[in-house]
């Protein structure tokens, strides 16, 4: 059975994510603080980790970077990570944290479900809602 860790200090975040995926036959492990993620990962060996960007004690990006460092030093296998983002600036930080996906708050359960399924298959999933807007070149606006 595949396992997903959901790490968020806000109960509503954990509830909304788990509700969207609970019928997929996945074991869901909930964690309240970023510092609790690494020990649980070592114990449970999950298939996916979902981190709230604003998680207490250790933010989502810092937790993601810690997990990547552990994997790079071969103390952990590589495990896909998704972040739950609040605002457009978070996209930049999520990219810097080298996560395989992200979800945007307020959550869309269909997107969460689709994203979790993609990430568990080894694909990436990026909700494009907060992506920066690309404007046409300045000279093409004149005319």
Language model features with spans:
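Two-component signal transduction core modules
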Residues: 49, 102-103
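Conserved phosphotransfer microenvironments
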Residues: 51-69
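Conserved acidic segment of CheY-like receiver
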Residues: 1-12, 17-21, 49
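CheY-like receiver
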Residues: 123-143
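Acidic, metal-coordinating helix/loop segments flanking the phosphotransfer/catalytic sites
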Residues: 32-48
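His-Asp phosphorelay/catalytic-motif detector in bacterial-type signaling
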Residues: 47, 72-80
């Amino acid at each position: 059975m595949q396992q997903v860790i959901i790490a968020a200090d806000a109960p509503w975040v954990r509830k909304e994510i788990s509700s969207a995926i609970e019928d997929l036959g996945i074991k869901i492990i909930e964690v309240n603080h970023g510092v609790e993620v690494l020990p649980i990962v070592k114990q449970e060996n999950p298939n996916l980790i979902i981190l709230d960007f604003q998680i207490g004690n250790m933010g989502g990006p810092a937790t993601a970077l810690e997990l990547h460092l552990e994997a790079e030093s071969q103390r952990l296998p590589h495990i896909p990570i998704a972040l739950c983002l609040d605002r457009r600036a978070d996209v930049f930080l999520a990219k810097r944290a080298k996560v395989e996906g992200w979800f945007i708050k307020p959550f869309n359960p269909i997107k969460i479900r689709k994203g979790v399924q993609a990430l568990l298959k080894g694909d990436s999933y990026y909700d494009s809602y907060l992506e920066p807007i690309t404007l046409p070149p300045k000279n093409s606006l004149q005319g």
